[in-house]
Amino acid sequence: MANIAHEMKAIYVISYRELRKFIREKSRIMGTMARPILWLFVVGGGMSRLVRPVGGINYIQFIFPGMIGMTILFASIFSAISIVWDREFGFLKEILVAPISRFSVVVGKAMAGTSISMLQVLILLVFVPVLGIKINALQFLLLLISSGMLAFSLTCFGILVSSRMSSYEGFNIIMNFLVMPMFFLSGAMYPVKLMPPVLREIAYANPLTYGVDGLKNILLAGASGTTMGPEYPAIVDFAVVAGFLAVTAVLSNLSFRRAA
């Protein structure tokens, strides 16, 4: 029991450090929040004049779940970059010589990334009444659970990549080749069913597709069966995200152990 308490404290300390770093970086907070808001009201506002409402859902409402997905994607994966920074500045060595398991380090980093993502999701949800989207208490709870699962899995994915990177530049290049395609091929901006066949097949293999679709099942349930509605049943979205979480959690832990 004492050992478990020690590891839990280590997870808390690592997470708390990352959260304090995030709160101090005002430019990072502004940058990560500005991106989805600009896409929502600038791109969404412009496209809503070209795309007719379907099933009572307009284009801005349609992309709102995708903007939540974008917020989670960028916040979670780029939270994992702290491993690269810690390695470059020697702090990672200090953590690794401490009497804590590698598993606790990974969980601490993943919990921090998830917490940062969820804070930003909560801020983004302020726009729900403005957009005319109505959610009840159960939908709000399901939204938090779905967002938390997606955030944890994507942070673990970022840790999986960053644990093998020795420099910030290398991580940034690889992530840009992964993050942007993941976002654009997730159904966040346009329905997967309307994509060209080749891109549609890639989208089916993209775990973010099911994360975004799960959010659509919660927020846009009234548009089910239309092009603006969710693509898959909610149980399929949940199963894929849960599987992705399990796989990335295991692989990120193994990768960090080997690289550390």
List each language-model region with its residue ranges:
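Residue-level recognition of transmembrane alpha-helices
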Residues: 14, 32-33, 63, 67, ...
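Hydrophobic alpha-helical transmembrane segments of multi-pass membrane transport proteins
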Residues: 36-43, 59-131, 158, 177, ...
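Short cytosolic juxtamembrane segments of multi-pass membrane proteins
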Residues: 254-260
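Transmembrane helix segments
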Residues: 45-50, 162-209, 213
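Short helix-capping/hinge motifs at transmembrane helix termini and TM-loop junctions
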Residues: 43-52, 74, 128-136, 163-167, ...
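Aromatic- and glycine-rich beta-strand/loop motifs that create alpha-glucan
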Residues: 1-35
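Short hydrophobic, aromatic-rich alpha-helical segments embedded in or entering the lipid bilayer
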Residues: 2-16, 188-226, 234-235
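Alpha-helical transmembrane segments and their short interhelical loops
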Residues: 102, 106-177, 230-253
